[in-house]
Structures are given as structure tokens and as C-alpha cells.
Amino acid sequence: MPVSRVKVKNRHLKKKTKKPLAFYKPATKFAGAVLIAGTLTTTHELLLQQTSPMVQAATNSSEVFIESIAASAKPVADANGLYPSVMIAQAILESNWGSSQLSRAPYYNLFGIQGTYQGKSVVFKTQEYLNGKWVTKDMPFRVYPSFNQSFQDNAYVLKTTNFGNGPYYAKAWRANAATYQDATAALTGRYATDPSYGASLNRIISQYNLTRFDGASSAGNTNSGGSTTTITNNNSGTNSSSTTYTVKSGDTLWGISQRYGISVAQIQSANNLKSTIIYIGQKLVLTGSASSTNSGGSNNSASTTPTTSVTPAKPTSQTTVKVKSGDTLWALSVKYKTSIAQLKSWNHLSSDTIYIGQNLIVSQSAAASNPSTGSGSTATNNSNSTSSNSNASIHKVVKGDTLWGLSQKSGSPIASIKAWNHLSSDTILIGQYLRIK
């Protein structure tokens, strides 16, 4: 029988106990940590049932898996000041290259995080090594809509876990770890008790050149972002402007578009972006126009600070219902004279599944607001363009923030905050910019 990665990984435990044949054992987790409602839950030793021996995929299949998860891992790691290479290696190691039952659809739990996610969980048998022996338990594990939410949850664990003496995983952050090897060393004995955990991660990172995903972001990156604008007068009373913006931690295309008064589509078009994923340190061209009283054919260079943004349509009224036994999206769409697609859009549903007790928006009307754009700038000719303030309020997420708390603070419904910021779940990240009004 082939020797699995996990057997090799936990070889130091062989003398203490025999591994039950009915289970598969990945990385040993920290025994005292627990992830419930966004904090770390108990996972000492996760054993997944298997029907056949698990063997590492061939190199080409490995690269396919790496690329498939890197698209989610890199932006999440960058936004949280973590090494993408380490996060990808963790996902590979914890899920055995995505072959564990928990990591596959429809569960997408790459890191074995316990608890519930948006009310969803799945029960698996786990084993914990307690008092010198293995104890088997049935425990609930989080079910995610996609790998992206799994990475976000893992980042939340690494950034917010605190047992009273400061952030528990702080030494694994890029700001405190000069190299990825320093980060993996900091995880060993904390994230996993296996003494070879860091070495296993380092081997994967080196073998598959995962440092290529660490990109422009560097340890201790203090880049606060910024923009430089070149304004060109076209003799018609309108200045066409091109702003170069440097992406910083927590930025999203939506947040940048709101601050600069242009659409996400405009940013994507100007920068040939095929998705909404952006990276720390990336340069983005933001194009727009500003009215001016200049009448000559002069070129002016200016540094500018954005002061306005577009105000999207605001919900003026909405009807919500609590799902009861027998309800379906189809029945609700018929009853409230709307479409299933519209219900899914309002409620950010990725499938047609709804749950008893779930609150759903079933009707919503909105009044469009006129966009206002402009920027205050200091140019070489000492002329200033006027600007107007939008009604939007942008908030930078700090430790302890929740959607519910921001909703209470701003007076805006949670559903509105999620709609304005294109959030598909209630998970928000430290450093993230959110429109809350």
C-alpha cells in the first residue's frame, strides 16, 4: 500500500498509537484553538474517511491544482499581509492536494476548520490525541461556497486569533517574517504540532516554485498606496485626466472606483483586467475627466487627492421574509412576482438551496442618484478644480468590526452594505474598504 503524505508527516506519532485503518489523518492542529463564529475552533487531529489509498497527483495535475487555488489564495494573502506561497502550501498539505473529501465540492474546506459557515456544516469523524490515546469524535466542519471563502476564513484565523497575549500567529505575518521560511517556522508548533510541519511546507514551496505568487508584496510592506495624476487640456474646456494608482492592502476595484468616481468596468478596461483580482503594489491607470477654466493648450502635471465618488442606487424599500418549511425560490418568486435570478442576486445566493429560518429579500425598489465626480488638485499653474462631496461613506475595516456592527453604526441594512460592496458572505477582512452609507 502506498505511504500517504500524512503518514510521513506524522511519523513521530507511530510509537504512541496505531493509526486506525478507517481514517485518513492530515496535519495535527493546535489542541487549544477553536474556530467558532470567526475565532479558532478545536481541531487537534482531523481524520477523513477514505475509500482508497491517496497518492499525490502527477506533476501536471499538481500544477493545475496550484493554479486553481492561487487565484483565490494570492489576493486574500496579500490583503492580509501574509505570504501567498505559504498559504498555498498549507492548502496543499492540509487537503492532500485537494483529494481529501472535506476539501472537495460541495464542502471546499481546505484547512479543516470546524464550526459552521453561514449556517452550513458537515459532520466528519475526527481523532484527537488526548491523554496518550486517540479519541474518535463526530465533529461539524464548515462548508464554504468556494475555495475563496475557505482562504478568507484561514486568513481570518491567522490575523485575529488571540489568547490574551497578543495575536497568536503574528510571527507568521509578512511584517514580522523576513522570509517565507520564517513564516513557516512560526506556524510550526502553533498552527500544527507536527515538528516537521514547517519543513513540509518549505519543501512544497521550493519544489513547485510557489514564491512566484509572492509577487510585488514584500515583508513588512508599508506601502500606503497613492496616485499621481497627469491632466491634459484639450482646448475645449475639459481636462482629460489619467491617474496612476498604486494598490495597497485592503484595496478592491469596487472601493477604488467609489473613491475616484469611476466604474469598475472603466478600471478593468483601462488596465486590460479580465477579472476583479488586483495585487498589492500593482499600478492601475484610472482615467476620467474634470472641468476646468483653462483655455490654453497647456499640459499640467499635478498630484491629486480624490474627494468625490459615485453614489450608486440606494434601496428605498425592501421586503424580507423568513423561510418556512415548504418554501422554495420558485414559490417565492411566483408569490412576490419576481424571478428566481433576482432573488438570488438580492440575497447573494450561489445555489437554489434555502434554509428554514433564513431571512430573504423578496422585493426591493431603488432610486437612482446622479453621479458626481471631481478632485481637488494642486497644479503648477495654481488653479484648483472644484469638487462636490458624495453621500457615500467609506470605512476601513479594523479589528473587531462585523457587518452587524457597521450596520448599527451607519444605520444601513446589512443587505445594503453587502450589495454596495459586492459581498457574497458576511466575512470581512481587516484593512478592507467598505461603503457603509
UniProtKB/Swiss-Prot annotation:
Enzyme Commission code: 3.2.1.17
Keyword Lipid biosynthesis carried by entry: no
Gene Ontology terms for molecular function: amidase activity; lysozyme activity; peptidoglycan N-acetylglucosaminidase activity
Main enzyme class: hydrolase
Single GO biological process annotation from the record: killing of cells of another organism
Residue numbers spanned by region Disordered: 217-244, 290-320, 367-392
Leader sequence residues: 1-57
Catalyzed reactions: Hydrolysis of (1->4)-beta-linkages between N-acetylmuramic acid and N-acetyl-D-glucosamine residues in a peptidoglycan and between N-acetyl-D-glucosamine residues in chitodextrins
Compositional bias of kind Low complexity: 290-317
SMART domains: LysM, LYZ2
One annotated Gene Ontology cellular component of this protein: extracellular region
Family matches, as InterPro entries: Glycosyl_Hydrolase_73, LysM_dom, LysM_dom_sf, MGlyc_endo_b_GlcNAc-like_dom
Principal cellular location given in the protein's record: secreted
SUPFAM superfamilies documented for this protein: LysM domain
Localisation: Secreted
PROSITE patterns xrefs: LYSM
Keywords for the protein's UniProt record, in alphabetical order: Antimicrobial, Bacteriolytic enzyme, Cell cycle, Cell division, Cell wall biogenesis/degradation, Glycosidase, Hydrolase, Repeat, Secreted, Septation, Signal
The keyword Cell cycle is assigned to this record: yes
Start and end residues of each LysM domain: 243-286, 319-362, 393-436
Function: Hydrolyzes the cell wall of L.lactis and M.lysodeikticus. Required for cell separation during growth.
Family: Belongs to the glycosyl hydrolase 73 family.
Domain notes: The LysM domains are thought to be involved in peptidoglycan binding.
Name the record gives this protein: Probable N-acetylmuramidase
